[in-house]
A protein has these predicted regions:
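Alpha-helical subdomain
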Residues: 1-45, 50-246
Length: 246
């Protein structure tokens, strides 16, 4: 689309590039995790019609991968998956802000790692709701040998050429979607502190420009300070809690 191309040239990013970046980084992080811990179990929250679960089951046939969504979407997704594979598991449903969420964790083996994924979700929650979600994940996941949470977040666009335009667009999105879409954090350290306070012990904030630069040339030294906002529209977070092995 001409507007997308203009944004990529003049703003340094667009919705198209942003979606591709976050999806690619989350997939890369999850693939690395599976290769490091082949026994990892996966729970993806609010995945909608994303084909990620299907793709990963094709790539890793023995993976225990479940999805959680709103009741109506869960029915639609279950039907779609089972048309492709009659053995595809049913998409689960629960309120992630109540103890109903805890029941979902009981369906996984605590002697194995658990990875939780969400994409395009947490900017729709205000800070108190986000904190409640994170505390629920760390509380209900405390008995697992390892607990990982992979998600994306839109930081305040303070270093973007069209920061005011993006802010206005986000307010419009908030009204149109009747949600709390907002920007919560300016720099990676604010995110790390917020996640630490919710019970995570390891928090890595991945900025796409540095990530793809470093992956393109492993001998290249990145000049971006990982503690500063590098200007990307979206970041990926890999938060974890790992038990000390005896």
């Amino acid at each position: 689309h001409p507007l997308e191309s203009w944004a990529e040239k003049h703003v340094g990013g667009s919705m198209r590039t942003t979606l591709k970046q976050r999806h690619s980084i989350i997939d890369r992080q999850l693939t690395d995790l599976i290769q490091q811990r082949p026994d990892v179990q996966i729970l993806e929250i609010a995945s909608g019609l994303s084909p990620r679960s299907w793709n990963f089951r094709q790539k890793f046939p023995n993976i225990h991968y479940r999805e959680l969504d709103l009741p109506e979407m869960a029915k639609i997704k279950t039907r779609a998956l089972q048309q492709l594979d009659a053995q595809a598991p049913e998409v689960l449903t629960a309120d992630i802000f109540t103890q109903d969420f805890e029941k979902i964790f009981l369906g996984f083996d605590t002697s194995r790692p658990l990875a939780i994924i969400s994409e395009g979700l947490i900017n729709y929650f205000d800070k108190s709701m986000l904190n409640k979600l994170l505390q629920g994940i760390t509380e209900y996941g405390q008995d697992f040998t390892e607990l990982h949470y992979l998600t994306d977040i839109y930081p305040e666009p303070v270093k973007n050429k069209l920061a005011n335009f993006i802010w206005t667009s986000s307010k419009l999105l908030k009204v149109m979607s009747r949600s709390s879409f907002t920007f919560h954090f300016i720099n990676p350290s604010e995110i790390q502190t917020f996640f630490y306070n919710a019970g995570f012990s390891l928090v890595d904030v991945i900025q796409p420009t540095a990530f793809f630069q470093n992956n393109a040339d492993s001998n290249l030294i990145s000049f971006q300070n990982p503690e500063e906002h590098g200007g990307d529209l979206v970041w990926v977070i890999h938060a974890a809690v790992k038990k000390q092995r005896s």
